[in-house]
Amino acid sequence: MGASQSAEQEARPEVVRIDRNEIPEEYKTVGVSSDVVSRVNATRVAGNDGESDRLRQELAREREEKARLREDMAKLSQLQQRKTAGISAAPVSISGNDLEERKKIFDDTVERVQKQFFAYHRENVCQDNENEIVRCLQENPGRVLKCAPLTEAFEKCVGEFRQQVLKGN
């Protein structure tokens, strides 16, 4: 007898789904005890506890970022309106405070965009494998098949790196 046959297996309740159109009219009213309702709610809450917390935190971060972007957009719109109002009237010199405010908003926006889209660059983790292949090809011109075993290690490295990127590590 194997270990899996002698060990107790976890009893999982079977899930039953019933469509309303499959139920005869006389059985459409079904009473469910509060115990059943609490068990269903408890399994639903227990199964998603960590995931729901993570999603709530992510949603809160995104909402904060969205609020900051809206504030910046509103400030930029106000500045744009002031600018167009100034152009349509008479050419008015920009005050020092207005200029500083515009510069600060612009710099903050540029910094946020750079941080969000351009800040993180992954290093070439497969550089060693790549260098070996290039060196082999240079040492063996016209004999590409001699370098074929090196490509397996390179492809494995690239595949692992791709999985890490997709997982978000």
Curated annotation (Swiss-Prot):
Disulfide bridge partners, by residue number: 126-157, 136-147
Keywords carried by this UniProt record: Disulfide bond, Lipoprotein, Membrane, Mitochondrion, Mitochondrion inner membrane, Myristate
Biological process according to GO: inner mitochondrial membrane organization
GO cellular component: MICOS complex
Phenotype of gene-disrupted mutants: Abnormal mitochondrial morphology with localized swellings and tubular extensions. Double knockout with moma-1 or immt-1 results in reduced or no brood, poor growth and withered gonads. Furthermore, in double knockouts with moma-1, the gonads contain fewer mitochondria.
Sequence motif: Cx9C motif 1, positions: 126-136
Membrane topology note: Lipid-anchor
Annotated ranges, domain CHCH: 123-165
Residues carrying lipid (N-myristoyl glycine): 2
Placement of sequence motif Cx9C motif 2: 147-157
Compartment annotation: Mitochondrion inner membrane
Task performed by this protein: Plays a role in maintaining mitochondrial morphology. May act as a component of the MICOS complex, a large protein complex of the mitochondria.
Family annotation (PANTHER family): COILED-COIL-HELIX-COILED-COIL-HELIX DOMAIN CONTAINING 6, MICOS COMPLEX SUBUNIT MIC19
Oligomeric and partner information: Component of the mitochondrial contact site and cristae organizing system (MICOS) complex.
Record family assignment: Belongs to the MICOS complex subunit Mic19 family. Metazoan Mic19 subfamily.
Protein known as: MICOS complex subunit MIC19
Organism this protein belongs to: Caenorhabditis elegans
Gene for this chain: chch-3
